[in-house]
């Protein structure tokens, strides 16, 4: 008897379980977030989704720095810029924590001065306004990302309901 090759016509694996009601209801929001640019997606996933992926962290820092650099004075010393770069991720963390918790307390200027290895007076004269501006850049990213998500979501609802 010669063996005959026959291809299986069905898979022996179990079928995938159907989507839960929550996943189904949540999918339009997920599509809205996925339609954003990389930095906005990264911010929403980090701040509101708890995703700590390094690629998200770098995308957020690059977006915040470019937004901040566009609004900061052009005549900033190279040494100051180098120290400011070290504050970008800290400003992201501070704004994210403030968004999540009402009891969040801002870091004191003396603490931030110690992190940069500068005196408190130097912090107040040189770095404090930059710190405020950097946090404003993060808040602007937050607002733009949330509004863009809402806009995409509403457009999706309009398309579905029409």
PLM features per residue range, with description:
Residues 45-46, 53-54, 78-107:
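Short, amphipathic alpha-helical "recognition" segments used to contact nucleic acids or chromatin
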């Amino acid at each position: 008897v010669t063996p005959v090759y026959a291809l299986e016509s069905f898979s022996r694996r179990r079928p995938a379980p159907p989507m839960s009601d929550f996943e189904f209801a949540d999918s339009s929001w997920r599509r809205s977030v996925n339609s954003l640019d990389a930095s906005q997606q990264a911010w929403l996933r980090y701040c509101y989704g708890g995703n700590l992926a390094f690629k998200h962290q770098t995308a957020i820092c690059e977006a915040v720095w470019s937004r901040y650099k566009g609004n900061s004075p052009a005549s900033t010393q190279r040494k100051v810029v180098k120290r400011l770069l070290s504050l970008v991720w800290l400003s992201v963390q501070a704004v994210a924590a403030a968004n999540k918790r009402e009891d969040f307390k801002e870091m004191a200027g003396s603490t931030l001065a110690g992190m940069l290895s500068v005196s408190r007076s130097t912090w107040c004269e040189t770095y404090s306004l930059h710190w405020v501006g950097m946090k404003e850049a993060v808040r602007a990213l937050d607002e733009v990302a949330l509004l863009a998500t809402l806009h995409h979501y509403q457009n999706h609802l309009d398309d579905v309901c029409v």
